């Protein structure tokens, strides 16, 4: 009967197993020493990156952030689009305003005057002769203003892309926020584009502290 005096195994009596257990204990101690000598044991574990917005560092930033949230909530909940129908896509735009989809439940109400609108839906083929009128209507809209390009013709010319009289995309005349593909896009697609515009407005940050302007 033999007693093995190895660290971690004091007081354990092993019967005839000195030769078999000894190398295992030595190997265990070697592995422990290598693990403790490695660089991973001395460096603390770094926390994982989190996709969370940074907290405001001052009361001023906190107030401005909350005001931004309030203004964005009011703005995205009361979008007033200006109808600028140029071709067959305008029929689907009217379909979205009909009772089946009822865009009024999202706060979207059509206005006849650009001075009362904050969204312009360009639906259809934009020609070179109509481009100045489009820009004039856009300039009459108050800030902040948004543009939704509806259909392939408004996005890039569509079926008439190679025509000499067609503008290859209304974004060459006015800045576009939302592109809706299709020829023509359905009323569901236009409604989805309006919801995406609301999400974009929700993330906007327009207010700034006076000393950071």
Curated annotation (Swiss-Prot):
<dbReference type="GO" id="GO:0005743">
    <property type="term" value="C:mitochondrial inner membrane"/>
</dbReference>
<keyword id="KW-0249">Electron transport</keyword>
<comment type="similarity">
    <text>Belongs to the complex I 20 kDa subunit family.</text>
</comment>
<dbReference type="GO" id="GO:0048038">
    <property type="term" value="F:quinone binding"/>
</dbReference>
<keyword id="KW-0999">Mitochondrion inner membrane</keyword>
<feature type="transit peptide" description="Mitochondrion">
    <location>
        <begin position="1"/>
        <end position="37"/>
    </location>
</feature>
<feature type="binding site">
    <location>
        <position position="183"/>
    </location>
    <ligand>
        <name>[4Fe-4S] cluster</name>
    </ligand>
</feature>
<keyword id="KW-1278">Translocase</keyword>
<keyword id="KW-0830">Ubiquinone</keyword>
<keyword id="KW-0520">NAD</keyword>
<keyword id="KW-0809">Transit peptide</keyword>
<feature type="binding site">
    <location>
        <position position="153"/>
    </location>
    <ligand>
        <name>[4Fe-4S] cluster</name>
    </ligand>
</feature>
<comment type="subunit">
    <text>Core subunit of respiratory chain NADH dehydrogenase (Complex I) which is composed of 45 different subunits. This is a component of the iron-sulfur (IP) fragment of the enzyme.</text>
</comment>
<dbReference type="InterPro" id="IPR006137">
    <property type="entry name" value="NADH_UbQ_OxRdtase-like_20kDa"/>
</dbReference>
<keyword id="KW-0679">Respiratory chain</keyword>
<keyword id="KW-0472">Membrane</keyword>
<feature type="compositionally biased region" description="Polar residues">
    <location>
        <begin position="30"/>
        <end position="44"/>
    </location>
</feature>
<dbReference type="GO" id="GO:0045271">
    <property type="term" value="C:respiratory chain complex I"/>
</dbReference>
<feature type="binding site">
    <location>
        <position position="89"/>
    </location>
    <ligand>
        <name>[4Fe-4S] cluster</name>
    </ligand>
</feature>
<comment type="function">
    <text>Core subunit of the mitochondrial membrane respiratory chain NADH dehydrogenase (Complex I) which catalyzes electron transfer from NADH through the respiratory chain, using ubiquinone as an electron acceptor. Essential for the catalytic activity of complex I.</text>
</comment>
<dbReference type="GO" id="GO:0015990">
    <property type="term" value="P:electron transport coupled proton transport"/>
</dbReference>
<dbReference type="GO" id="GO:0046872">
    <property type="term" value="F:metal ion binding"/>
</dbReference>
<feature type="region of interest" description="Disordered">
    <location>
        <begin position="30"/>
        <end position="53"/>
    </location>
</feature>
<dbReference type="Pfam" id="PF01058">
    <property type="entry name" value="Oxidored_q6"/>
</dbReference>
<keyword id="KW-0560">Oxidoreductase</keyword>
<keyword id="KW-0479">Metal-binding</keyword>
<dbReference type="GO" id="GO:0032981">
    <property type="term" value="P:mitochondrial respiratory chain complex I assembly"/>
</dbReference>
<dbReference type="GO" id="GO:0051539">
    <property type="term" value="F:4 iron, 4 sulfur cluster binding"/>
</dbReference>
<dbReference type="GO" id="GO:0008137">
    <property type="term" value="F:NADH dehydrogenase (ubiquinone) activity"/>
</dbReference>
<feature type="modified residue" description="Hydroxyarginine">
    <location>
        <position position="111"/>
    </location>
</feature>
<keyword id="KW-0496">Mitochondrion</keyword>
<protein>
    <recommendedName>
        <fullName>NADH dehydrogenase [ubiquinone] iron-sulfur protein 7, mitochondrial</fullName>
        <ecNumber>7.1.1.2</ecNumber>
    </recommendedName>
</protein>
<dbReference type="InterPro" id="IPR006138">
    <property type="entry name" value="NADH_UQ_OxRdtase_20Kd_su"/>
</dbReference>
<keyword id="KW-0004">4Fe-4S</keyword>
<feature type="binding site">
    <location>
        <position position="88"/>
    </location>
    <ligand>
        <name>[4Fe-4S] cluster</name>
    </ligand>
</feature>
<dbReference type="GO" id="GO:0006120">
    <property type="term" value="P:mitochondrial electron transport, NADH to ubiquinone"/>
</dbReference>
<dbReference type="GO" id="GO:0009060">
    <property type="term" value="P:aerobic respiration"/>
</dbReference>
<keyword id="KW-0379">Hydroxylation</keyword>
<keyword id="KW-0408">Iron</keyword>
<keyword id="KW-0411">Iron-sulfur</keyword>
<keyword id="KW-0813">Transport</keyword>
């Amino acid at each position: 009967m033999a007693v093995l005096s190895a660290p971690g195994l004091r007081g354990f009596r092993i019967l005839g197993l000195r030769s078999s257990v000894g190398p295992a204990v030595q190997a265990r101690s070697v592995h422990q020493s290598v693990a403790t000598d490695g660089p991973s044991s001395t460096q603390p574990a770094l926390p994982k990156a989190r996709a969370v917005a940074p907290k405001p560092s001052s009361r001023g930033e906190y107030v401005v952030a909350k005001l931004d949230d309030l203004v964005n909530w009011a703005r995205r909940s009361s979008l007033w689009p200006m109808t600028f129908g140029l071709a067959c896509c305008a029929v689907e735009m009217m379909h979205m305003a009909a009772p089946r989809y009822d865009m009024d439940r999202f706060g979207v109400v059509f206005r006849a005057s650009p001075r009362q609108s904050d969204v312009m839906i360009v639906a259809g083929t934009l020609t070179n002769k109509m481009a100045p009128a489009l820009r004039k209507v856009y300039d009459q809209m108050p800030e902040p203003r948004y543009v939704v390009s509806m259909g392939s013709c408004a996005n890039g010319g569509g079926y008439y892309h190679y025509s000499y009289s067609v503008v290859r995309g209304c974004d060459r005349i006015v800045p576009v926020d939302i592109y809706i593909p299709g020829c023509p896009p359905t009323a569901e697609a236009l409604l989805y584009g309006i919801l995406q515009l609301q999400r974009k407005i929700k993330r906007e940050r327009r207010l700034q502290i006076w000393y950071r302007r």
